[in-house]
Every structure is written in structure tokens, then in C-alpha cells.
A protein has these predicted regions:
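C-terminal motif of bacterial Sec signal peptides marking the signal peptidase cleavage site
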Residues: 21-25
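Gly/Pro-rich hinge or "lid" segments in bacterial periplasmic/extracellular proteins
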Residues: 173, 184-258
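Short, well-ordered beta-strand elements
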Residues: 39-49, 100-103, 134, 176-177, ...
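Bacterial N-terminal signal peptides that target proteins for export
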Residues: 2-12
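Surface-exposed binding/hinge segments that line
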Residues: 132-133, 140-142, 146-203
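N-terminal lobe/hinge region of extracytoplasmic solute-binding protein
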Residues: 46-96, 219-221
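Bacterial signal peptide processing site
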Residues: 27-29
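Aromatic- and charge-enriched surface segment that lines or borders ligand/interaction sites
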Residues: 90-148
Length: 260
């Protein structure tokens, strides 16, 4: 393997990332339904603060991460017991020396951006999630222009190491490989962090610096997509409205049609 730059700084950072439940103090009447596909229901939840950014690679506040976890899906997720399990990845292997992690992506994961806001999936509004999306996400984490708060990323941010030299590469469109400088028992679970979620480079560039800052600059690859983001700095009627993302295979699971 030619790429063997340090990913341990990423692992250290992500170990400190925590997640929040979707809802605090809200009622869930539809859970009384014994048989339902979840459609037609609206799940309402309250956040302690307004999300500052829905960019997985730069969001640091708890409110933002709560929304991000519903809009995006990474390689790994935490189950109800806090244990890591595969999400967008079909399987993975670890080399005998513990330095190489290879993930095979599921083929039924897609990005969706409702460009005309009609809640209909047009052919040009969805595209495949690929290994390159994860590579670009990790490059953004370490890119000096991102002004990341990552610990131990000084070498990259100072320009001594180019973001492209980070130890992650796309072997193919569906195979992603990480190279570590030393074994890290926490690396797999740290991939459940929001920062490790994919980023579509083409869409990112189209947002012209607005990525994750408003409804029109968010493309979803998770269970829901962003339908409305009303944000008033001086008011208390702020609202985020998400709809179930039908292009994602997770739509087969039981959950409500809408979140607000």
C-alpha cells in the first residue's frame, strides 16, 4: 500500500464525538400502531438550540449533529446499545497487522437533492453514493481551508501534508480503504461519527461555499431529506422539516413519513 499517512488524529478526534437522541420530551402517538409502514405520520421533536450547520465535516454542536444523523448515513452507526454496526457498508475486513481497513459499500445507497422542491424523485436528482464521496469527506476534514478543529492535524493544516495524502483511498466505486499508521482498536467505532459521513464533491462545489447552511445546500443520503429550514435569529418559531427519503433503502424500515 502506497498511502500510509496518519489517521490516528482522526480517530482521536472522533472518540470525543457524542450523539443525541432524536427527541427530548415529545410524544409519539403512532408507536401505538401495531402494524404500519410509518407513512402518513409526522414526528415532532424539540431541539435545545438551532443547528448551526448541517455540514457533517464541520458541525460541532449537538443540535446540528442530531439533524445530520437523520439526513446522512455513514459506513458505521451505533445501535440502541451504543455498539457500532455496519450501516452503508456491506462488509469490511481488517489486515492481520491492524493497519488496513477495507470496506465494501452497499449498492442501494443514493444521494437525493429535491431541486424543484416537488417531493418527486427525478432521474437527475439522485445519484449513487461512492467510495470517492468518503475520500472527499476525509480530505475536507484535514483541508486547511476547512479550518477544522481536529486534534493532531497541524501537519495537514500547515500545508506540510496535502489533504490528498491522507490514508484513505477509493479502490473502486464501491470499495474504500483506510491505512493507519498504527493499530487503533477504536477506529471502527469512531467511523460512526457524523464527521465520517460521505460528502459528494460535485454537489459540494455547486453550493459555492454554502454547503450545509440552508435548505438549498444540503443533499441527503440518509433516511430523510431536508424539505424546509426556517431560521430566524430573533424569533422562536424556527423549524426544520424533513421528509422520508424514498431513494434510500432504509425507507423499507418503519419510521414516520415526516420529521419536524
Amino acid at each position: 500500500m502506497s498511502v500510509r499517512k496518519s489517521l490516528r488524529c482522526f480517530s482521536i478526534l472522533l472518540a470525543a464525538v457524542c450523539t443525541l437522541p432524536l427527541c427530548t420530551g415529545c410524544s409519539i402517538p403512532f408507536l401505538e400502531q401495531e402494524e404500519s409502514d410509518g407513512s402518513g405520520y409526522l414526528f415532532t421533536a424539540s431541539l435545545a438550540a438551532n443547528p448551526k450547520s448541517l455540514d457533517p465535516q464541520s458541525a460541532t454542536d449537538a443540535a446540528s449533529k442530531t439533524i445530520i444523523e437523520n439526513l446522512y448515513e455513514g459506513l458505521v452507526e451505533l445501535d440502541e446499545n451504543g455498539s457500532p454496526q455496519l450501516a452503508a457498508a456491506e462488509n469490511y475486513t481488517v489486515s492481520p497487522d491492524g493497519l488496513t481497513y477495507t470496506f465494501t459499500l452497499k449498492s442501494d445507497r443514493f444521494w437525493f437533492y429535491d431541486a424543484n422542491a416537488d417531493d418527486v424523485v427525478d432521474d437527475d436528482e439522485k445519484w449513487q453514493v461512492t467510495a470517492d464521496d468518503y475520500v472527499y469527506a476525509f480530505q475536507r476534514i484535514f483541508d486547511p481551508q476547512t479550518q477544522s478543529c481536529l486534534q493532531n492535524a497541524d501537519a495537514v493544516q500547515s500545508g506540510q501534508l496535502a489533504p490528498e495524502e491522507i490514508g484513505v483511498r477509493a479502490v473502486s466505486s464501491t470499495v474504500l480503504q483506510f491505512s493507519l499508521s498504527r493499530p487503533d482498536a477504536e477506529f471502527f467505532s469512531n467511523l460512526a461519527s457524523t464527521a465520517a459521513m460521505p460528502c459528494s464533491e460535485t454537489f459540494f462545489q455547486q453550493t459555492k461555499g454554502r454547503y450545509g447552511l440552508d435548505k438549498d445546500s444540503v443533499a441527503s443520503c440518509g433516511a430523510f431529506y431536508l424539505r424546509l429550514w426556517f431560521y430566524d435569529h430573533y424569533g422562536n418559531q424556527n423549524q426544520i422539516f424533513m421528509r422520508r427519503n424514498s431513494v434510500n433503502a432504509e425507507a423499507r424500515r418503519v419510521y414516520p413519513t415526516n420529521l419536524t
